[in-house]
Amino acid sequence: MNSTPSAPPLKMEALDLDIFQPSLTLGLGAILVVLMSFLAFLSYTPSFDKKVPAFTTHTHPFIGAADFMWRKNHFWRASMEESKTGTFSFWVGKKHVVGLSGEAARKTFMDSPGLDFVGGARIRGVSLLPNPPTPEIFRPGFHHGRSFFLRRMIDMQKTEMLKRCLPRFTSDSRGVFDELAKDPSGITNPAVACWHVVFAHDVILFCSEEIVDDPKAFPNLLQMIDILQGLSSFTKVFLPWLPTMAGMTRARRYKYMKSIFEPLVDRRMKRGAIRREDSLQLMIDNGDRRDLIIDFVIAAVIIAPTNSRILTGQMLNVMAAYPSWQEKAYAEIKALAKSYAKDPEAPLADQLDSMPLEAWEAGFPSIDLCFKELVRMWVAISMMRRNISSRTDEFIPAGSFAIYNTTETHFSEELYPDPHTFKPERWLEGNANVQKQAYGFVGWGEGRHPCPGKRWAKLQLNITIAYALAKFKWTSVDKTEHKKSTQESGHGVPLPSKLSKFSPREEN
């Protein structure tokens, strides 16, 4: 039998790696060059005049003072302890920052026309928008040197506007605590309980109640603002050029907010549109541009609740922790409400409904004392400015940033003996400690940048707290948490988690 011889097996040649070695070496070298160039870019810092304060050692390679974002108060204290002059420099990514302390530096920080308040926000990491350029609503020169934002903020807090909104403010606030009475647990987080009405009233005052009354748009907006207030972005401050998921998320949120406000503004600006007596109508009647109106409203509803969402809840926690002050405030509420009541025998909440604006603003001295002390202890932050002057041979060079930490003032033993203890009586007339230094209290801003929303913030708190105390007696669950006055998180402002008990007042 003939057999066909099989084909000889193929000869497998060994793979010659030498063929690929040059390409592999070239690729690895290219990656290494790119990596080294990137690290060199991160490490590069420009030179400065010798007047600049010495740099703190509390930094991290390549990115600089990351603790400024992560543990800001620890970073401040550690850098000050190291400093021989009470000042220090540090890098936030590529941004040069000067930390200041002392009375003279504080006065310069507050009064200098070259230190820009809006520009300082670039190192906070909380904005929805890319850092530069400064939005037009914040640029000076709109009216007597003021920005569009400041001018309209002031307009919307005029007496006529507040009187117009007052019935809605009081009815909403009362409604919050009427609803809370249905909770069988008798325990709540006051900050969470008040957050809805605080934000709703900010939207009503600075835009229109049409948004608040929209059953779909308002809950979504409330949730979005709540998330945004608790966030601060490390990469936005240290690596602003780096595309991140967080940055894209912020851009989507900004776009969504515009989708809420733009249709309302467009509808109201049409010829023959139904008029409403609100702040949106005020801007339309003034002939303000559409883009300025939309940017103002978005900025206002983000900025306005930043502190009020914290302080309103904390004020109730304070009332719960200090029964004597709660009862003083309650007695003042009862006396004032009765003096304006149509029926002095009606429930206290009904009596409050009849009070005029001037009574709401000036009739609660104990609440005012407690609020000022609360602001002292809780507004413990790093204030930030940017030098927008053209001179580079300065202590704070042109383009650099300056920060001042308010804990130096608000927790000064000289100005506030026993500063970590809540003592509203320290603000009674005749107590001159706080007058010992220039700007001994900066809770409402000072100098060239006083808080433009102070009137509204105090009125809003008075209304909310008055109805809360009229309906309930508050008791502290944890009598220590109210003393916590600083955060070691980022620059965001998450809601406090403290709980308080509430029980109906017998007289109601």
From Swiss-Prot:
Q: Name one Pfam family in it.
A: p450
Keyword check for Repressor: no
- Compartments it resides in: Membrane
Q: What is its EC number?
A: 1.14.13.-
User: Can you list the disulfide-bonded cysteine pairs?
Assistant: none
GO CC annotation: membrane
Q: How does it sit in the membrane?
A: Single-pass membrane protein
Role noted for this protein: Cytochrome P450 monooxygenase; part of the gene cluster that mediates the biosynthesis of the dimeric xanthones cryptosporioptides. The pathway begins with the synthesis of atrochrysone thioester by the polyketide synthase dmx-nrPKS. The atrochrysone carboxyl ACP thioesterase dmxR1 then breaks the thioester bond and releases the atrochrysone carboxylic acid from dmx-nrPKS. Atrochrysone carboxylic acid is decarboxylated by the decarboxylase dmxR15, and oxidized by the anthrone oxygenase dmxR16 to yield emodin. Emodin is then reduced to emodin hydroquinone by the oxidoreductase dmxR7.
Can you say what this protein is called? Cytochrome P450 monooxygenase dmxR5
Per the UniProt record, the source organism is Cryptosporiopsis sp. (strain 8999)
Kindly list the organism's lineage: Eukaryota, Fungi, Dikarya, Ascomycota, Pezizomycotina
